[in-house]
């Protein structure tokens, strides 16, 4: 124990806590760490400015050299005036400015690509709102080195969709692929190299009805809105044609003002044929010999390009007017009643005709567009300016105010329509050229006021013998009643008369039939009827049963027995 006690710094009572060393007063008091960490707040603006000033003095920051951070975005006011021709090129990939606006030309493409093929103005743009670059994917993209070699391609060959050799109906995991057709009996599809070969023979009326009826109450369709027929809709229509022979396209809004242009663009770009059209609904047939595997494939647009800058539609001094006249027309247009009211996402098929008819009686016409986007009714005004034609005066208060222009000519040159004077009509005193001259009023004292629609209805009634022109105006009540009775008889005879013949056989039987050759073929508008009446003799349908087994044959036998 004496030896152990002689050792220094040895605690004989190890179980007891050792005495802690004396804390140095210079080092400060010891504080244990808190159970919850203290949050670190951002430095104040004063401290931040001091630090930044200190850094700029000692170690100045280098400017950011990343070009991606310098590109303009939708909040920047980018504007660059352009001229007609090539504005950007990358090898064979060029961006053009022409009559069709901004178009993109790719090597091997059948036509110049655009964002919208139907809603591009006919006026050349004067500037662009973003740098000229392609909205398509680049042809090649180098793979960055990731430390590993790229994966090998799969050896499994995935079969492509082939309309001529579709997968079997009972195969699991494969959707239905529509076969080509309809084809006459005994004929087979063949590969088509151009549009005429893919379409094949023209469809008959009963074939059109057979193709359209399943789509009448089906919502599987392509919706066409304010942008019109866009580039990516080409691939969308072909994806519809993969499953069905007819693609239903429903148009609403701005494109319906000029449906003829929409139908023309659809047939040109897709290669199909429009077999039926009702209002804003179009039925697009793919063709008898269509094959999804050999369809034309186009690159998709990855984003919507910014619309270019076009000249202003509303000029302060329109062509053919002075500044005072334009101001007077705009003031009088505020009290003018609109001819119609356009609803949002509506179908404006008859708008151009209504504006032309309104110009027959007034030099100013106003169309009300409540609730429409400003870009929508401005596009509608641009279309009316080109199709009617007319001069745009104002877009104030969501209304389109138009003037028919100096060079306007009436469609009714022989019998011009004379507007009636009324207190509510303020358009009669707008243009002195609109007032009828005294010679016209004296020469035609019996001219009545009527709209072009009523005149067309009267002409149709005269042609169908439902109306008659009275040559004598001074008729008594009895004579007028006789004329009315004669008209009723002729109209009923015209409606219920048809060519019928009665042929008597030796047995005394009689057969009645109607000759349908003289029946006028109207435009195909109603598909709820039967379409089997236009089958040709060489391609007639197969008989339903043996001869003499139909119920009609039994009725004929009974009639023959009675006649005997």
Swiss-Prot record:
InterPro entries the record matches: CAF1P_plant, RNA-binding_CRM, YhbY-like_sf
PROSITE patterns noted in UniProt: CRM
Limits of the CRM domain: 201-297, 319-415
Keywords assigned: Chloroplast, mRNA processing, mRNA splicing, Plastid, Repeat, Ribonucleoprotein, RNA-binding, Transit peptide
A single GO cellular-component term on record: chloroplast stroma
Protein's GO biological process: Group II intron splicing; mRNA processing
GO molecular function list: mRNA binding
Pfam families membership: CRS1_YhbY
Region described as Disordered: spans on this chain: 14-73, 420-448, 526-549
Annotated localization: Plastid, Chloroplast stroma
Transit peptide feature range: 1-43
Superkingdom, taxonomy of origin: Eukaryota
Segments of skewed composition (Acidic residues): 526-541
Role summary: Essential protein required for the splicing of group IIB introns in chloroplasts. Forms splicing particles with CRS2. Interacts with RNA and confers intron specificity of the splicing particles.
Protein known as: CRS2-associated factor 2, chloroplastic
Native species: Arabidopsis thaliana
């Amino acid at each position: 124990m004496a030896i152990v006690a002689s050792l220094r710094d040895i605690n004989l009572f190890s179980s007891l806590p050792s005495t802690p060393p004396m804390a140095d007063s210079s080092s400060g008091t010891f504080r244990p760490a808190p159970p919850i960490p203290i949050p670190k707040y951002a430095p104040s603006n004063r401290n931040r400015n001091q630090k930044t000033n200190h850094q700029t003095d000692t170690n100045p920051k280098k400017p950011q050299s990343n070009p991606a951070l310098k590109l303009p975005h939708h909040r920047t006011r980018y504007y660059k005036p352009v001229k007609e021709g090539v504005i950007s090129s990358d090898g064979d990939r060029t961006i053009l400015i022409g009559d069709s606006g901004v178009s993109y030309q790719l090597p091997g493409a059948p036509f110049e690509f655009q964002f919208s093929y139907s809603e591009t103005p006919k006026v050349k743009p004067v500037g662009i709102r973003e740098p000229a670059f392609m909205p398509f994917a680049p042809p090649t993209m180098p793979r960055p080195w990731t430390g590993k070699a790229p994966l090998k391609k799969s050896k499994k060959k995935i079969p492509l969709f082939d309309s001529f050799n579709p997968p079997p109906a009972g195969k699991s995991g494969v959707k239905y692929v529509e076969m080509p057709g309809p084809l006459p009996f005994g004929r087979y599809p063949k590969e088509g190299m151009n549009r005429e070969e893919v379409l094949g023979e023209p469809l008959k009326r009963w074939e059109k009805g057979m193709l359209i009826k399943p789509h009448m109450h089906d919502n599987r369709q392509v919706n066409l809105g304010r942008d019109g027929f866009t580039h990516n809709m080409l691939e969308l229509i072909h994806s519809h044609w993969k499953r069905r022979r007819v693609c239903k396209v429903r148009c609403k809004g701005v494109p319906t003002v000029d449906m003829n242009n929409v139908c023309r663009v659809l047939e040109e770009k897709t290669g199909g044929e429009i077999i039926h059209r009702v209002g804003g609904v179009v039925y697009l047939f793919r063709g008898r010999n269509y094959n999804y595997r050999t369809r034309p494939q186009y690159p998709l647009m990855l984003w919507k390009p910014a619309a270019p800058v076009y000249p202003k539609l509303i000029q302060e001094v329109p062509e053919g007017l002075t500044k005072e006249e334009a101001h007077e027309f705009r003031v009088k247009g505020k009290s003018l009643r609109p001819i119609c009211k356009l609803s949002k996402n509506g179908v404006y098929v008859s708008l151009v005709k209504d504006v032309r008819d309104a110009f027959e009686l007034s030099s100013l016409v106003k169309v009300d567009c409540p609730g429409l986007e400003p870009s929508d009714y401005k596009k509608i005004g641009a279309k009316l300016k080109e199709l009617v034609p007319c001069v745009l005066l104002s877009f104030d208060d969501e209304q389109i105010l138009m003037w028919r222009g100096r060079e306007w000519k009436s469609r009714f040159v022989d019998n011009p329509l004379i507007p009636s004077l009324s207190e509510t009509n303020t358009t009669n005193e707008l243009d002195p050229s609109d007032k009828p001259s005294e010679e016209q009023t004296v020469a035609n004292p019996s001219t009545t006021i009527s709209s072009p629609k009523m005149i067309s209805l009267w002409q149709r009634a005269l042609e169908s013998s439902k109306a008659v022109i009275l040559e004598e105006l001074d008729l008594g009540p009895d004579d007028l009643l006789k004329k009315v009775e004669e008209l009723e008889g002729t109209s009923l005879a015209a409606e219920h008369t048809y060519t019928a013949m009665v042929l008597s056989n030796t047995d005394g039987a009689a057969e009645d039939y109607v000759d349908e050759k003289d029946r006028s073929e109207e435009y195909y508008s109603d598909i709820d009827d039967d379409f089997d009446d236009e089958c040709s003799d060489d391609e007639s349908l197969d008989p339903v049963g043996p001869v003499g087994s139909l119920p009609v044959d039994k009725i004929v036998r009974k009639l023959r027995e009675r006649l005997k």
